[in-house]
Amino acid sequence: MLAKLKSLGPGLLYAGAAIGVSHLVQSTRAGAEYGYMLILAIILAHVFKYPFFALGPKYASESGESLVAGYARLGKGTILLLGFITLSTMFTVQAAVTIVTAGLVQKMTGWSFSAPWISAFLLVLCFLILRIGKFNVLDNLMKVIMIILSISTVLAFLFSFQVDKVVVENSMQVFNLKSEKDMSFLLAFVGWMPAPMDIAIWHSIWTISSPSKKSSLFDFRIGFYGTALLGICFLALGANTLYGTGVELQSSAVGFASQLVDIFTVSLGSWSYWLIMIAAFTTMFSTTLTCYDALPRVMAGIGLEVKSTKVSNTKLWRIVLGIGALLILFFFVSNMREMVNFATIVSFLTAPILALLSYRLVLLRNEELKLWSIWQKNLALVGIVLLFLFSIRYLMLIL
């Protein structure tokens, strides 16, 4: 068992990318605004996304290639579609996770620099870490980060049931599927719960890069079930400390960071301030780092398939991603809530397309590689239908 835990790598990178905005921001917000009403959304999101997320490490370990190479087997049009989807979402995804991290840095250090400038510093730091250490640094950092976060979150969750909050009359919202506001939040919540659909592609790339691919599914399950548990814990923290109090979570990065830390310290006590501050920062920095590692690799992989060349341009895409994310933060959206909502909703709307591509790939190679069982294929099909139906429902509300 200890040997398996020591070998954990891509599964923790998955967890590092997943436990970030979706948990610290969206799950906490779901609990604060709707109480326990959206806990079912966390469970269903994990259930219906499971076959697609498991496909990443499974396909990589069985075929020896990433999902990018797998999608290329479906035709050039498919790989170009993947390139378009990735290019249309990557800048907002990176901008969203980086500005949340910047808010935590502002809270932790008291720096007077604006969130976009701190974001620039963070992305340069990520670039240097990945340039110097590559996969090993990411792998080793994640083991420490996930242990700190998991222990502190579970403890805060348990103690939050003892919090004596003041409930304000008529301040308890009830979720309504006919409400554009509530539907927008649901899609934003599910879009990144536990992570965007693209993470299966990232996971397949990390699995290929990992020294050992044999424990990839054990590795994945540890990360997957861990993110489900922590998602529920963060929702409960929001519900137990803020729901019904009339206190609204702030939209600015530093304002939200302050409230997030307060939620933990109210549950655990003032002694936990720096423990939580460090855990929250390391969690969000891990998300920023893993996204900054994965997205350029995906684009570079797409380039290799389209051009049929062996020369990777990951470093170039990393620079492009950093510049694009910073342009958004400096000149378009610096409000954390708007940035997160936009990125997560776009991820939800592209999810059914990515899910359909994965389903087609399984149909092509399942007999050869045994990628999905019958129940997983059926579950995936139901998931695709639900993703399309919710996307259509949302578009009908806003158009």
What are the roles of these predicted feature ranges?
Residues 40-55, 217-245:
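Selective recognition of specific alpha-helical transmembrane segments in multi-pass small-molecule
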Residues 14, 41-72, 81-93:
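Juxtamembrane transmembrane-helix boundary signature
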Residues 27-31, 54-77, 105, 109, ...:
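Flexible loop linkers connecting adjacent transmembrane helices
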